[in-house]
Amino acid sequence: MGGLSIWHWLIVLLIVALVFGTKKLRNIGNDLGSAVKGFKDGMKEGEAPADAQQLPRSGSVDVNAKETTRSDSNKA
């Protein structure tokens, strides 16, 4: 009894359609769809400059570098 069945949802949908009208609901659907599309486009635009702005690596790595510890530096 705690869950809503398909009949409950159909009755709620019918009441919403009667209160707002199908034209108003269609406009809300179009507005929501365009908002989602705009959000996705904005996310794509935000990703492109981040990839282009990667800084080139500079410097070199010494492959013969020796790892020193604190006790090694105290001995010298």
UniProtKB/Swiss-Prot annotation:
Part of the twin-arginine translocation (Tat) system that transports large folded proteins containing a characteristic twin-arginine motif in their signal peptide across membranes. TatA could form the protein-conducting channel of the Tat system. Belongs to the TatA/E family. The keyword Transit peptide does not apply. GO terms for biological process: protein transport by the Tat complex. HAMAP family: TatA_E. This is Sec-independent protein translocase protein TatA. Pfam families: TatA_B_E (PF02416). Disulfide bonds: none annotated. One of its GO terms (molecular function) is protein transmembrane transporter activity. The chain crosses the membrane at residues 1-21. Residues 43-76 are annotated as: Disordered. InterPro entries: TatA/B/E, TatA/E. The Tat system comprises two distinct complexes: a TatABC complex, containing multiple copies of TatA, TatB and TatC subunits, and a separate TatA complex, containing only TatA subunits. Substrates initially bind to the TatABC complex, which probably triggers association of the separate TatA complex to form the active translocon. Keywords: Cell inner membrane, Cell membrane, Membrane, Protein transport, Translocation, Transmembrane, Transmembrane helix, Transport. It is found in: Cell inner membrane. The keyword Mitochondrion does not apply. Residues 64-76 have a biased composition (Basic and acidic residues).
